[in-house]
């Protein structure tokens, strides 16, 4: 597992990033992450962005990845981190972390995630994983552009902007191709409904009201299945807008203070 860390706060924040594929942020993306996490650093947290395990078995599931993070916390953080922020596919892993390893964190926030990915989201992410695994940043960028510009009418614009986006934001060499595909398979097979009632710690779930990957109805179902869940919906926002909003750290820190 590879990592990026900054800040000298006494409390540790572990960020479990989305996927398929997990990377140590570089270049433009690293700057975006630093801005996104500035509020946590100001609140006294040391930030840890940790990738998934490298060279995972092909059969590795989201539950197995949660076990990997729990093992990391046990071995490198003394058995407990102050706060876990788990986003998108990382939030899928976070659901299993909360259910199977509640002692490994003080608080957990799940951002733009839910019990199951939509059919559209599965299709897009499967194509994204194939492009990233092939080392084709341009094609991966074109698929990424579909997050913001879905539908046939904007295909020409996605194909125009995609290669530029891919080269500036994505790093196909940063994660083994086999791991990207393993994460994609785990994502496609993911359905956490059976495990959610087993979660005992309080959970903060933040979702976009117009998220095509994790529709609001599924997010609401997820919150109902978790015994102690606070759901906040950003009504007008989709997946990327909600996940990158400055409201996220504000709401997460308010949740931590309240608990």
Regions found by a protein language model. Give the residues of each.
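Short beta-strand/loop motif that positions the catalytic acidic residue
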Residues: 199, 205-207, 211
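Conserved alpha/beta-hydrolase catalytic His-Asp/Glu region
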Residues: 119-121, 139-186, 195
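Conserved HGGG/HGGXW glycine-rich cap/lid loop of the alpha/beta-hydrolase fold
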Residues: 1-57
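Flexible "cap/lid" loop of the alpha/beta hydrolase fold
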Residues: 95, 99, 107-135
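Catalytic active-site module of serine/aspartate enzymes centered on a nucleophile-bearing elbow/loop
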Residues: 228-259
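Gly/Ala-rich beta-loop-alpha elbow adjacent to hydrolase catalytic centers
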Residues: 85-90, 94
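Conserved acidic catalytic loop of the alpha/beta-hydrolase fold
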Residues: 64-82
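Conserved alpha/beta-hydrolase "acid-adjacent" motif
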Residues: 212-218
